């Protein structure tokens, strides 16, 4: 039997999903769908890389996982497409999988916030890396690179976009030593 909070979450999530499909964020190049028609708690999302950015021409896939007490608790959002970005975790480990996102709306989630509020912030994130809120390793490697060698950072970001997010990307070809198999 479902508890009240899960039933409420299902209603809220279903309504948000319907709203986003009735009035999609096409001006931002964002679409949402379901991985499985029987599970409203897991969405797939696509974001087109904005023009004149490191991510231009890319098609980025994300997964949105809603908790049973949504909207009282924040959803989990992860990039499934590898992306070289200051505010997206790219290091793969058992406890911190690829693609976790650092954005203010998620970090400062308030009861009643919505995915519709977060999606434009994700699009804005592709316009500009935020060095004040990096999702980085303990040595701040990417942040230092972004600040001290922006040309190299840009090359890496464009490489990742071309390699993993272009329409012709071969998603099974990753740089040596990288294992993204759990995202398939």
Predicted regions and their residues:
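Acidic/polar N-terminal loop/beta-strand segments that form early-domain functional surfaces
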Residues: 48-50, 65-67, 80-82
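Domain-scale recognition of soluble eukaryotic interaction modules
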Residues: 1-13, 20, 74-184
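Proline-anchored loop/turn motifs at beta-strand termini and strand-loop-strand connectors
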Residues: 65-75
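N-terminal onset of structured domains
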Residues: 3, 17, 21-59
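A generic structural motif
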Residues: 51-53, 66-68, 106-111
């Amino acid at each position: 039997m479902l508890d009240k909070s899960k039933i409420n979450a299902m209603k809220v999530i279903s309504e948000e999903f319907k709203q986003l499909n009735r009035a999609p964020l096409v001006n931002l190049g964002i679409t949402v769908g379901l991985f499985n028609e029987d599970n409203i708690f897991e969405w797939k999302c696509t974001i087109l890389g904005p023009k004149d950015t490191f991510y231009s021409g890319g098609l980025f896939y994300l997964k949105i996982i809603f908790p049973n007490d949504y909207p009282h608790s924040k959803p989990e959002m992860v990039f499934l497409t590898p992306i070289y970005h200051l505010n997206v975790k790219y290091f793969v480990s058992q406890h911190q999988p690829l693609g976790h996102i650092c954005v203010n709306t998620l970090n400062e989630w308030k009861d009643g916030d919505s995915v519709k509020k977060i999606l434009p912030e994700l699009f804005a994130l592709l316009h500009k890396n935020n060095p004040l809120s990096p999702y980085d390793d303990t040595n701040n490697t990417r942040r230092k690179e972004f600040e001290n060698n922006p040309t190299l950072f840009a090359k890496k970001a464009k490489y990742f976009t071309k390699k993993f997010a272009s329409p012709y990307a071969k998603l099974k070809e990753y740089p040596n030593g990288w294992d993204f198999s759990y995202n398939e």
